[in-house]
Amino acid sequence: SNSRYDIVLFGGINYDTESTELLLKSKKFSNLDFVSQSMSEEDSRGGSSWGYLPGTLQEVTNIEHIAIKKKLKVSMFTGNDAMEEQFKFLNGANSPQIIHISTHGFFFEDIEQGDNYDASKNPLNRAGLLFAGANNSWQGGKQVEGLEDGILTAYEATNLSLQNTELIVLSACETGLGEIRGSEGVFGLQRAFKNAGVEYIIMSLWKVPDAETAEFMEQFYKKLFSGKTIPEAFLFAQNTMKKKYPDEPYKWAAFVLVR
């Protein structure tokens, strides 16, 4: 029966949330023990910052509506509420069947060699997802005591326990990119979430336009919540998009299902 699906959605995230606001919201997570990791000074990217993704709010809102229609249990975190703490809270017994994260993802490819770089030689420190307020520490701002930095690294994800989670969808820019390391294959987030115990991962290998991303996800979830398996629903969404955009594979071919 599909009633067992419960789903947690993150999207429409505010990357500029003030630390004071996050600190207030983080109170409810204060007794939880997370593995935390901060950006090192060298990793922070100085001037650049992450922009709001309006398409992601539409995307998760659509999925929420589909889930509610099917009478599934759904939680959605957007804006300032889409905190890294909130994601880490989905650990262990709180781990839902499906987690859908629609946000910026990143991967640092090459590293200038420097003394402090040992930590960053590990590819798990160089891939991640962005949550509320991430711009502060991304731009080298001061870390606030007792607060996550809004940047979930693959290393932090590896330390979560997501055995109850059948599927994680990373609907984001560049999240599929990893570092090819001999026969070990692709590191990065994919590896991290597998280590955390997730069975299936859907991710994109390049940035797909917002409208088509939302469309793909809608096709996928409608089928999934109607009782199809994850691979069946994924194949259906792919074929539907392929028929609709035969000459524009960039609009759908980026999505991959990893088991």
Describe each PLM feature range.
Residues 1-259:
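Catalytic cores of enzymes
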